[in-house]
Amino acid sequence: NLHLNDNGFTYFYDDDWDKTQAAFRLESETFPGLTARDGSYSKDDFRDFQRYALSRGVEVIPEIDVPAHSLAFTRFRPSIGSTPEEYGKDHLNIMAEETYGFLDSLFTEYLAGPDPVFVGSRFNIGTDEYSNRDSVVVEKFRYFTDRYIRFAEKYGKTAMVWGSLTHAKGQQPVKVDGVEMIVWSNGFANPQEMHDLGYKMVSMPDQILYIVPHAGYYHDYLDTRDIYDTWAPHDFRGFTF
């Protein structure tokens, strides 16, 4: 899973959104100026990278993480972002039609055509850590998730998501069949609940497998011996399937 966009936490940057690091690291001809200047993939380089990996039996799964983790997009186009008073500038405004038009165009740039930029069979649309402030937000988030699952599938991709449907429980249906969910935090996606809904799950428990150097809340390095001795992928931190 290759994360093509993200941003830092404001508390590492004097609680100032304008100072907070953010980047989108893939060439975009649809939105010139969106791509980070301090390191990025060209479209051709990214195609070549994925094909090389496939030739070695590895599928690179591209991820564009929305509607949270999106400061690179809201900095490029502030009109699609939430305000700091709402959720934070790293949240897209999922109530605004302009947001959907922007993402439709961006995703289409990489999914469409005879030689799409995203080469493999999967595309990760993100969907982790968005606000669940009230039922209106939750239901719109669930709509957003379902919409972009189906958008990915329209281009022949298996849609992947970061599990968030325990955090965002609601009534709006979210597609299950054919969707692959990364279960990373039991508070965001309870493994038993997701299993009962019928999702195909990928076990990636954050407290065991995440490396975020110097952050203080995840590992600086992985204890590979401990992981080998005490954990197996079917163990979702207390839920074993």
Predicted features along the sequence, with ranges:
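Redox-cofactor binding/interface segments in oxidoreductases and associated redox assembly factors
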Residues: 2, 182-183
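Generic domain-boundary/flexible-linker signal
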Residues: 11-13, 71, 170, 192, ...
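Flexible, acidic glycine-rich loops studded with aromatic residues
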Residues: 164, 172-179, 186-241
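Substrate-binding cleft of carbohydrate-active enzyme catalytic domains
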Residues: 1-155, 159
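Surface-exposed extracellular loop regions of Gram-negative outer-membrane beta-barrel proteins
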Residues: 159-166
